[in-house]
């Protein structure tokens, strides 16, 4: 205040004013500052005094033919004096006014195409809805956000090649357009911009806006997708916010959102398979998002989310060096630690082996709804400053920090046994066990933590064990702040490794990510996600598994058929049958498998008993590890539609229905495709008839008349005998059984007796 008063006094004296306004600046340092380099040091001032001159603009000599020397009012538009140091003409700002009114016009057809991003922005704003303004304290935190809606996701280099190819096709220089998106965009833009008269440089700038993601590190309190960021200046100030609903969506935001959903689904599914890493890669490579291969999106899209980063790590891409715990992104800002295994006892006297971080460290913790600064020593929380949207979010952050601190009072606060498992039924590691335990109920943790009196510090208040604010007391070391903690700004990416259980580590061996960190939140994707991998069939429920399994067999029938007869074990081990197993009652899996495999073996042994429909129908059941038992089944149960439904071993059922006339299969009423039966199946399937309810008595016996065909055989009465022509022109004597027997005993004896009868 003193200084200001002094300055005011000085300014009131006329001599001061005179010195400041009239004296020339002759100090070398100052002259140097304002004259060195081409960068304008005071653009506003420069503009002011330039515009005060008569001819502040220079133009090409051609201007003299295109614009008259004087306008209607007789004012001079350009001067005959050359611009010093160039052969350009000095031009008055009035020339621009004249040109805008009288200059030649051009076709506007290309404008919406070149300035597409601007036209689309206007449309979004026109259809957007601005709500009321609320005055309240804004907790803004700086996040890396996408600032230009509607862009493709090309890398700078890829975009550069596309722009050169579209705008300057005749320029020298090698351009390699390899990715699908590059080729599509180039073709599309070349067509759109034929005969375009807009300055090439401008076209290049605008193309860059359309092709490349631009990010800035900005303070944000609300939505972070690009359609919100483009109106950031309208929706949030220091002490106010205005509600806004965008008037349209843009593909880049949809890609980001759908990518996260696809990655989460894939990681969750991979976790429960026999080889998580191999499965994850197979799924990433066979999935498309909005018609683009997921692996291409992963290579280009900078979205940082736990599941997305696990997929990137699996593909060998670099990811951010921060690590994730309890859904918060931790970034160490100072200090260091060494890790040591230590055994600790919970309040329930259960022994846990934890990796203790020894040493002083400081971290920033950033979550979706809360942020914090954490200072800790070996197994001790020194200070935690939290800010969050609401009580719930603040509590979540406090729990995560308390568990992360590894303090003894936290471990002693455990009541009951810790036995949380992941989706694959494996026990979680101790740190995640503790986290899950306290996320379920943190009452004891907060009560046992301890409280302390607090000093009155600007912008900080205390928080009590019941999560209510207080100005006098607070949980030990914990304070709530009005200010958020900025996200980690660096875009640095590091090389990581991933093990088969999808744990991602940096080069020092620190775990950055693991499947436990992947959010369980469900969402509906904006773009269509097409999972071609059989592992994702179950995402739409049991019915989809059933239909997809049979569709897969039918689509690949030619190869399946060969494998069925030559290398069945390899066929049974196909991963496409894995999802189906979850539909078969656990207790019956092994028995069904043993039964079906035996049946198939007989079909292979007995010539002519091949039955396409039956093989397709029963094949998925043979994939489970078989149990050797003499169990016979006339129907097999699958769990769909909330109950067990039957598939008949012989004949149709609502689950599996083959229409002989149309040769089409329907599974649960859904068409599963057309079956191509073997040409000799309908006629020469004698043996299958022999197998079904007939007993082979021996070689042909002339007393029973000429050999019958299969079709005639069905007219026999029970107990009646007849000669039958089988397979390779051999004739045997059979008798229709007096009772309906089991398939297996029939076919076993039939096999042996045919051999005996023929030999």
From Swiss-Prot:
Gene Ontology terms describing biological process: 7-methylguanosine mRNA capping; cap snatching; DNA-templated transcription; symbiont-mediated suppression of host gene expression; symbiont-mediated suppression of host mRNA transcription via inhibition of RNA polymerase II activity; viral RNA genome replication
Residue ranges annotated as coiled coil are: none
HAMAP family under this entry?
INV_PB2
Q: What is its main location?
A: virion
Q: What is this protein called?
A: Polymerase basic protein 2
Q: How does it assemble?
A: Influenza RNA polymerase is composed of three subunits: PB1, PB2 and PA. Interacts (via N-terminus) with PB1 (via C-terminus). Interacts with nucleoprotein NP (via N-terminus).
Q: Name one GO cellular component term.
A: virion component
* Intrachain disulfide bonds: none
**Function (record text):** Plays an essential role in transcription initiation and cap-stealing mechanism, in which cellular capped pre-mRNAs are used to generate primers for viral transcription. Recognizes and binds the 7-methylguanosine-containing cap of the target pre-RNA which is subsequently cleaved after 10-13 nucleotides by the viral protein PA. Plays a role in the initiation of the viral genome replication and modulates the activity of the ribonucleoprotein (RNP) complex.
Q: Which InterPro entries match?
A: Flu_PB2_2nd, Flu_PB2_6th, Flu_PB2_C, Flu_PB2_CAP-bd, Flu_PB2_middle, Flu_PB2_N, INV_PB2, PB2_helical
Q: Which UniProt keywords apply?
A: Cap snatching, Eukaryotic host gene expression shutoff by virus, Eukaryotic host transcription shutoff by virus, Host gene expression shutoff by virus, Host nucleus, Host-virus interaction, Inhibition of host RNA polymerase II by virus, mRNA capping, mRNA processing, Viral transcription, Virion
């Amino acid at each position: 205040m003193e200084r200001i008063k002094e300055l005011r006094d000085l300014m009131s004296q006329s001599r001061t004013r005179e010195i400041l306004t009239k004296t020339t600046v002759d100090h070398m340092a100052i002259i140097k500052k304002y004259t060195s380099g081409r960068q304008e040091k005071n653009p506003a001032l420069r503009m002011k005094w330039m515009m005060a001159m008569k001819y502040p603009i220079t133009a090409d000599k051609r201007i003299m033919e295109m614009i008259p020397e004087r306008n209607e009012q007789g004012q001079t538009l350009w001067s005959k004096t050359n611009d010093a140091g160039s052969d350009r003409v000095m031009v008055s700002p009035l020339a621009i006014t004249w040109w805008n009114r009288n200059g030649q016009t051009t076709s506007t057809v290309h404008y919406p195409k070149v300035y597409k991003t601007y036209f689309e922005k206007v449309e979004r704003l026109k259809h957007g809805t601005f709500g009321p303004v609320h005055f309240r304290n804004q907790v803004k935190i700086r996040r890396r956000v996408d600032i230009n809606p509607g862009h493709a996701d090309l890398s700078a280099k890829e975009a550069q090649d596309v722009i050169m190819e579209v705008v300057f096709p005749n320029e020298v220089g090698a351009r390699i357009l390899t990715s699908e998106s590059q080729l599509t965009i180039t073709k599309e833009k070349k067509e759109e911009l034929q005969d375009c008269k807009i300055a090439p440089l401008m076209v290049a700038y605008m193309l860059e806006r359309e092709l490349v993601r631009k990010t800035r590190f900005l303070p944000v309190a609300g939505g972070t997708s690009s359609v919100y960021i483009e109106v950031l200046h309208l929706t949030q100030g220091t002490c106010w916010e205005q509600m806004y609903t965008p008037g349209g969506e843009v593909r880049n935001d949809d890609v980001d959102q759908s990518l996260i959903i696809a990655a989460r689904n894939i990681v969750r599914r991979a976790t429960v398979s026999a080889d998580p890493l191999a499965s994850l890669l197979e799924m990433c490579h066979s999935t498309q998002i909005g018609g683009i291969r997921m692996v291409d999106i992963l290579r280009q899209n900078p979205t940082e989310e736990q599941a997305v980063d696990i997929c990137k790590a699996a593909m060998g891409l670099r990811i951010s060096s921060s690590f994730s715990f309890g859904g918060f992104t931790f970034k160490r800002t100072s200090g260091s630690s060494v890790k040591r295994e230590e055994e600790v006892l919970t309040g329930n006297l259960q022994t846990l082996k934890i990796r203790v971080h020894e040493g002083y460290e400081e971290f920033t913790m950033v979550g979706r709804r809360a942020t914090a600064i954490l200072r800790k020593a070996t197994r001790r929380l020194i200070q935690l400053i939290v800010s969050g949207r609401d009580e719930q979010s603040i509590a979540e952050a406090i729990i995560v920090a308390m568990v992360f601190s590894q303090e003894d009072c936290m471990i002693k606060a455990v009541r009951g046994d810790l036995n949380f498992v992941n989706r694959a039924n494996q026990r979680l590691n101790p740190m995640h066990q503790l986290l899950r335990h306290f996320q379920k109920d943190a009452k004891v943790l907060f009560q046992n933590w301890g409280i302390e009196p607090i000093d009155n510090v600007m912008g900080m208040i205390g928080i009590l064990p019941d999560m209510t604010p207080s100005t006098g007391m607070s949980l030990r070391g914990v304070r709530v702040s009005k200010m958020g903690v900025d996200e980690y700004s660096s875009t640095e990416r590091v090389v990581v490794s991933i093990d088969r259980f999808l744990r991602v580590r940096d080069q020092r061996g620190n775990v950055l990510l693991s499947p436990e960190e992947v959010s369980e939140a469900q969402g509906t994707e904006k773009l269509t996600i097409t999972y071609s991998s059989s592992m994702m069939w179950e995402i739409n429920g049991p019915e989809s598994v059933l239909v997809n399994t049979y569709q897969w067999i039918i689509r690949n029938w030619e190869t399946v058929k060969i494998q069925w007869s030559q290398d069945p074990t390899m066929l049974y081990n196909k991963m496409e049958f894995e999802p189906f197993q979850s539909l078969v009652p656990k207790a019956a899996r092994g028995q069904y498998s043993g039964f079906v495999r035996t049946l198939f073996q007989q079909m292979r042994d007995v010539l002519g008993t091949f039955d396409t429909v039956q093989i397709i129908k029963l094949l998925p059941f043979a994939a489970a590890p078989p149990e050797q038992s003499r169990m016979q089944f006339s129907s097999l149960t699958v769990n769909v539609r909330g109950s067990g439904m039957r598939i008949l071993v012989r004949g149709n059922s609502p689950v599996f229905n083959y229409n002989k006339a149309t040769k089409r299969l329907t599974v649960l009423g859904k068409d599963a495709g057309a079956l191509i039966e073997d040409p000799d199946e309908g006629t020469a399937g004698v043996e299958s008839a022999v197998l079904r309810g007939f007993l082979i008595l021996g070689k042909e016996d002339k007393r029973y008349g000429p050999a019958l065909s299969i079709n005639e055989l069905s007219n026999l009465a029970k107990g009646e005998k007849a000669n039958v022509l089988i397979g390779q022109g051999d004739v045997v004597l059979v008798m229709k059984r007096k009772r309906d027997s089991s398939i297996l005993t029939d076919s076993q004896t039939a096999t042996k007796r045919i051999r005996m009868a023929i030999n």
